[in-house]
């Protein structure tokens, strides 16, 4: 009966999407504890007049994963203590070896907490996180979790692995989410030091034998670790229950019902694939919407096209209790309220949070600095221009210039560093400016214009003082000055170059870059 109901729901949704020339959809429902497939809808019904690849089994067809793998990276980094749930991650214009990720919204927050980056499915922070974690390790983790479609070595995918640079199947993805849930559930079935059974990580099954579904007398070989720990999984699934999704993942308040669901969407480049996967302690529901032909369509996103179908399927399933918190491998610690990192003695606002045990080893707050100011905190000073007994040692939350530039536009309470008092000569200030493009040490291509003429690179700089004048020099030649919007066209030859920027206060920034060729 469930199979018939889900088939009808899938066909009804596709019928509504047909007006946008979206002709295919697929859905899976499986039991989390056993992996048994309860419903399998490989495609929508064929139209009477024409076929749109309706005979293709989409569930086993490799498709670009979009953002659907981001929860596994978040969990892995929690597991290793590389981040805490609310650790700030950069969200700024980024180019890494020619790879330039963009957020769905096309804008930047400057810095955003890791959990909010996952909830909002921000691409730029995800790339920074993967760079920190290393894509080679993530490639290995995904294979360990059951992703069979990674047929190329890690370098083939690089950092794009987190943004849909690899293909996955709905079958594998559903199995991986189910394995997360199963690991969390079975953690409590094995009291003692060793609580993990590697056999909990397995693909979905069409048929589950009675011994598997009801348990067996055979004692599993237990270990004290797994690809992902129960604590990291628990924290990740809780983050994925967030209902309000700004930006790409918006408008789901009306699904805030009695059922608690951890869910994630994904959208591939070119709007070719819409994914939605949800997991509870009882069920995993995985949905794909798109065209079997690979044709992209406007509005073909995981949020708009796939998630409504997933929630309609969940409406046919029973609810239940949520996953238990694995307190045995978690610690309660204090963190800086602003950076999300372990607090130091100069963090003036702290929160108490539960973290994975290795979170105790994570970096302490790197954003709070002690600066020397006047008593009213309006100006920075130092010992050569202010008597020591009149200098106030002040704790200040300081973002790097590029992050600050974007962060300030969305966080009105952010306090930029106070300027130095005019009588204070600045000899070694905190970094005042930062080059957004080209990045230090980067290697860039400069394309030719459509008319064949030599193209130009547009340099971009941000400064803490919005009204300052900056003077630009390339390889010792003065190029000109900028004020407020620090963008400057340059036309360098192929080879290595030195770019020097000097502001009106004498602060200097020197960066090296290389032009590889003119395309």
Walk through the language-model features, giving the residues of each.
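Flexible glycine/proline-enriched surface loops and loop-helix/loop-strand junctions
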Residues: 53-59, 109-112, 119-126, 155-162, ...
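Active-site-adjacent helix/loop patches that line small-molecule binding or acyl-intermediate pockets
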Residues: 1, 25-26, 89-94, 105-149, ...
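Active-site beta-strand/loop architecture of penicillin-binding DD-peptidases
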Residues: 25-67, 72-76, 143, 173, ...
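Conserved catalytic neighborhood of penicillin-recognizing serine enzymes
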Residues: 33, 83-138, 202-235, 241-242
């Amino acid at each position: 009966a469930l199979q018939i109901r889900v088939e009808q729901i899938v066909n009804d949704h596709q019928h509504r999407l047909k007006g946008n020339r979206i002709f295919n959809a697929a859905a899976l429902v499986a039991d989390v504890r056993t992996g048994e497939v309860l419903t399998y809808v490989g495609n929508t019904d064929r139209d009477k007049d024409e076929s749109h690849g309706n005979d293709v089994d989409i569930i086993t067809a490799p498709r670009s994963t979009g953002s659907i793998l981001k929860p596994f990276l978040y969990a892995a980094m929690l597991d290793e203590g590389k981040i805490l749930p609310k650790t700030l991650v950069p969200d700024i214009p980024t180019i890494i070896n020619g790879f330039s990720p963009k957020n769905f919204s096309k804008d930047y927050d400057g810095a955003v907490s890791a959990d909010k980056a996952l909830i909002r499915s921000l691409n730029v922070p995800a790339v920074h996180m993967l760079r920190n974690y290393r894509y080679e390790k993530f490639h290995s983790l995904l294979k360990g979790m059951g992703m069979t479609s990674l047929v190329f070595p890690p370098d083939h995918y690089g950092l794009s692995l987190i943004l849909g640079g690899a293909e996955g199947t709905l079958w594998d993805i559903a199995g991986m989410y189910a394995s997360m849930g199963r690991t969390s559930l079975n953690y409590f079935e094995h009291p003692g030091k060793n609580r993990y059974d590697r056999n909990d990580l397995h693909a979905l099954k069409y048929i589950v034998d009675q011994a598997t579904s009801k348990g067996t007398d055979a004692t599993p070989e237990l270990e004290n670790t797994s690809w992902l720990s129960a604590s990291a999984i628990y924290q990740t699934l809780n983050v994925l229950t967030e209902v309000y999704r700004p930006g790409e993942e918006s408008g789901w308040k009306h699904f805030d019902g009695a059922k608690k669901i951890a869910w994630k969407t994904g959208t591939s480049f070119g709007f070719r694939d819409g994914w939605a996967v949800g997991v509870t302690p009882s069920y995993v529901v995985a949905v794909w919407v798109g065209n079997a032909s690979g044709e992209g369509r406007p509005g073909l996103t995981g949020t708009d096209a796939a998630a409504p179908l997933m929630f309609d399927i969940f409406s046919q399933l029973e609810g239940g209790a949520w996953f238990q918190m694995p307190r045995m491998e978690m610690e309660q610690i204090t963190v800086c309220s602003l950076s999300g990192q372990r607090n130091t003695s100069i963090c003036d606002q702290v929160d108490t949070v539960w973290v994975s045990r290795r979170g105790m080893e994570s970096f302490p707050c790197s954003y709070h600095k002690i600066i020397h100011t006047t008593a009213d905190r309006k100006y920075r000073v130092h010992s050569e221009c202010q008597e020591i007994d009149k200098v106030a040692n002040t704790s200040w939350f300081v973002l790097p210039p590029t992050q600050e530039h974007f962060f300030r536009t969305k966080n009105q309470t952010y306090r930029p560093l106070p300027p130095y008092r005019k009588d204070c000569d600045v000899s070694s200030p905190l970094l005042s400016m930062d080059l957004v493009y080209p990045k230090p040490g980067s290697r860039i291509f400069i394309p030719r214009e459509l008319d064949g003429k030599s193209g130009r690179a547009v340099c971009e700089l941000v400064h803490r003082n919005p009204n300052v004048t900056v003077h630009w020099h390339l390889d010792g030649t003065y190029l000109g000055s900028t004020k407020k919007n620090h963008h400057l066209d340059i036309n360098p030859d192929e080879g290595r170059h030195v770019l020097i920027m000097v502001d009106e206060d004498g602060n200097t920034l020197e960066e090296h870059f290389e032009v590889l060729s003119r395309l």
